[in-house]
């Protein structure tokens, strides 16, 4: 555990004995299915593309381009220089996927911070390497004996990096609660020995390089800075439910799952009925949540706070579920790295299967889930590490013809400020995936303009667009596909970096650009 805590800081800075004949499999498949989207023709290779019709022009925000003028190019240039967002450093590439023609470009080979547009690269790589039917397995094993109603020995939860295990994003039976109830139904009344978490599918470094500590710690409730782990549960976050008490007293705090983290409550309930300034901070060196500030007398709210040690969080949550099922526990809770002599394989009791990858990448792209993205990134990475995932991503990109010399891949979510991508590389990935064998799953994973419960819910209504958003401080991006009235599908990538004006103006400009592409 000490090693994990040390690595966490480093990463931020730079049944069988009971007579069970087989394994009970829990299918965590959610109820909803993605909306199908029609496929598109393949794009031509880069060597066959026609020259750009974009206007030859330089601007304060755009650099130079040398290409014939076109109405689309003039309109897009106007949008980028009309004073709304001209202080941004802009990158853009727009390509007709039917003809391969470049319709517009601006700094297409310059490197930009992609923010969550990095998830396009991550999910494309995962879909190509793992396939849309890939499913994670999380197993409960037992090595010991059972006398009467008492299990004695080692219970091992063997993780595979499944981000959906107990997740609120893809609703289904809670696997830990189901396991506990099944044990109780089989007559178990007490468990003695060791409860061990095997998280070795991933390495022990929970954070990738380049995350902005100040930024992610101030984004409570947005799944920012969640630790990656080979054994994860409930999105690796604890829900801190806060409600007002009497004036002058600390607010009431309840945790879900209960008993999994400590709370240091230094907040107060004010005498006012409105106006709250409560802050919920995480302490990276331990599973402690710190509350400060004030809450109004009418306040009720929930903040999701990432836990620092997902493995111990999972094990402690299982202990709570066992007790809730009426099973007494006298167990030592251990990370497998703390066990001097690793337990034998024992026998499988239960297995939890994740939904297929096609549904997992839809969570990543439609809801921009950073935790799912990081788990997926390490899943296909060599050695279960961020560095191994970076190398494998680079190999995929080079295989499909992307020039990676100006690309940097340090994480799967795009939270890293050490990620770099060019507009050309992004469009080349989009073009490749538009004719990929898994293109149906690919298109179904992308948010559509105005689609409920996605990052485009309030944007681009009635515009035929499927695209991934991206946002960090001083970064806005949108990349994906637009469909024109004649049915032609256009791939586009728009990046805005280093602006000092209001972010909403940049976002509005990007949306206006996309509408022009779709005309």
Where do the PLM segments sit?
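Short beta-strand scaffold segments in enzyme catalytic cores
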Residues: 92-94, 138-140, 479
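A short, well-structured edge-of-sheet supersecondary motif
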Residues: 81-105, 334
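Residue-level preference for non-acidic, small/hydrophobic
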Residues: 100, 119-126, 195, 231, ...
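Conserved serine DD-peptidase/penicillin-binding transpeptidase domain
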Residues: 2-10, 19-83, 129-403
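N-terminal glycine-/serine-/threonine-rich phosphate-binding loop
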Residues: 62-73, 98-114
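Small-residue-rich helix-loop
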Residues: 89, 103-105, 367-370, 374-519
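Short, ordered coil/turn segments that flank beta-strands lining enzyme active or ligand-binding pockets
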Residues: 97-98, 246, 485
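Short active-site loop at a secondary-structure junction
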Residues: 105-125, 361
């Amino acid at each position: 555990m000490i090693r994990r805590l040390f690595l966490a800081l480093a990463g931020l800075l730079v049944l069988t004995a009971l007579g069970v004949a087989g394994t009970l499999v829990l299918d965590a498949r959610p109820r909803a299915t993605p909306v199908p989207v029609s496929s598109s023709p393949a794009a031509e290779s880069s060597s066959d593309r026609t020259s750009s019709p974009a206007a030859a022009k330089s601007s304060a925000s755009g650099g130079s381009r040398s290409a014939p003028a076109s109405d689309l190019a003039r309109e897009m240039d106007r949008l980028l220089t009309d004073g709304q967002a001209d202080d941004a450093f802009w990158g853009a590439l727009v390509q007709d996927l039917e003809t391969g023609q470049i319709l517009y470009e601006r700094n297409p080979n310059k490197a930009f911070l992609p923010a969550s547009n990095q998830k396009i690269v991550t999910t494309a790589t995962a879909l190509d390497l793992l396939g849309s039917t890939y499913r994670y397995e999380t197993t409960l094993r037992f090595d010991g004996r059972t006398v009467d109603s008492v299990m004695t020995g080692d219970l091992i939860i063997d993780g595979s990096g499944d981000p959906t295990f107990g997740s609120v994003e893809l609703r289904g039976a809670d696997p830990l609660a189901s396991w506990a109830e099944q044990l109780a139904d089989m007559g178990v009344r007490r468990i003695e020995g060791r409860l061990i978490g095997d998280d070795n599918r991933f390495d022990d470094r929970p954070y990738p390089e380049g995350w902005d500590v100040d930024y992610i710690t101030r984004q409570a409730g947005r799944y920012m800075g969640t630790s990656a782990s080979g054994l994860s549960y409930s999105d690796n976050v604890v829900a801190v439910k806060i409600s007002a008490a009497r004036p002058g007293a600390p607010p009431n705090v309840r945790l879900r799952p209960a008993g999994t983290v400590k709370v240091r409550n230094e907040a107060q309930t004010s005498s006012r009925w409105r106006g709250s300034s409560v802050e919920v901070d995480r302490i990276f060196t331990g599973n402690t949540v710190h509350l400060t500030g004030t809450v109004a007398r009418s306040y009720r709210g929930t903040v999701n706070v990432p836990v620092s040690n997902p493995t111990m969080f999972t094990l402690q949550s299982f202990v709570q579920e066992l007790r809730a099922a009426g099973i007494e526990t006298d167990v030592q809770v251990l990370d497998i790295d703390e066990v001097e002599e690793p337990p034998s394989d024992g026998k499988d009791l239960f297995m939890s299967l994740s939904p297929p990858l096609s549904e997992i990448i839809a969570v990543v792209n439609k809801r921009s889930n950073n935790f799912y993205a990081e788990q997926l990134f390490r899943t296909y990475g060599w050695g279960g590490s961020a560095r191994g995932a970076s190398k494998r991503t680079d190999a995929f990109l080079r295989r499909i013809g992307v020039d990676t010399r100006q690309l940097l891949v340090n994480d799967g979510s795009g939270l890293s400020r050490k990620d770099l991508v060019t507009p050309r590389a992004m469009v080349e990935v989009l073009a490749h995936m538009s004719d990929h064998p898994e293109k149906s799953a690919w298109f179904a994973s992308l948010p559509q303009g105005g689609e409920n419960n996605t990052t485009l819910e309030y944007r681009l209504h009635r515009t035929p667009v499927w695209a991934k958003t991206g946002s960090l401080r001083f970064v806005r991006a949108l990349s994906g596909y637009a469909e024109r009235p004649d049915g032609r599908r256009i791939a586009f990538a728009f990046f805005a970096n280093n602006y000092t004006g209001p972010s909403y103006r940049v976002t509005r400009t990007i949306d206006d650009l996309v509408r022009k592409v779709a005309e």
